[in-house]
C-alpha cells in the first residue's frame, strides 16, 4: 500500500507541470520580451496567448511595447505566428503598443480587452 501511495504521489508531481499552464511554449522576441504561444493547425502554426492557466493569473504580463515576430523557432522547429488568441493581451494596462506581423490573419474576440 505504501508503494502505491508513493507511486501516485510521484506521478502527480511529474504530471502537475504539464497541466499548470495554458500556453504551450514561451519564447523571447528580439527585444527580450517573453511571448507566450499555443500551437494551432495541428501544431504547424502558433497563436499568441496569455501566461498561466487563466488570463487573470498574470494580469499585466505584457507591458510597454511588444513586437510579435512573424515566425518563432523553438526546439529547432520554426512555426509561423498566424493569430492572436482570446484574451492574449486582456487587462494589460501597461501595454503601450503591439506590432503585429503580416503573418497574423486572425485576432480572437477580446484579445485586447
Task: State each model region's role.
Residues 12-21:
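Hydrophobic h-region of N-terminal signal peptides that target proteins for export
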Residues 41-43, 61-83, 93-106:
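Structural signature of tandem-repeat unit edges
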Residues 29-45:
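Short, ordered beta-strand-loop transition motifs
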Residues 47-51:
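Non-globular, low-complexity intrinsically disordered regions
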Amino acid at each position: 500500500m505504501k508503494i502505491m501511495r508513493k507511486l501516485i504521489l510521484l506521478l502527480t508531481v511529474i504530471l502537475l507541470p504539464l497541466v499548470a499552464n495554458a500556453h504551450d511554449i514561451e519564447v523571447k522576441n528580439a527585444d527580450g520580451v517573453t511571448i507566450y504561444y499555443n500551437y494551432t493547425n495541428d501544431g504547424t502554426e502558433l497563436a499568441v496567448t496569455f501566461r498561466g492557466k487563466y488570463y487573470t493569473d498574470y494580469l499585466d504580463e505584457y507591458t510597454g511595447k511588444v513586437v510579435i515576430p512573424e515566425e518563432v523557432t523553438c526546439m529547432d522547429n520554426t512555426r509561423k505566428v498566424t493569430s492572436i488568441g482570446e484574451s492574449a493581451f486582456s487587462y494589460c494596462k501597461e501595454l503601450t503598443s503591439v506590432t503585429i506581423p503580416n503573418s497574423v490573419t486572425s485576432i480572437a474576440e477580446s484579445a485586447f480587452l
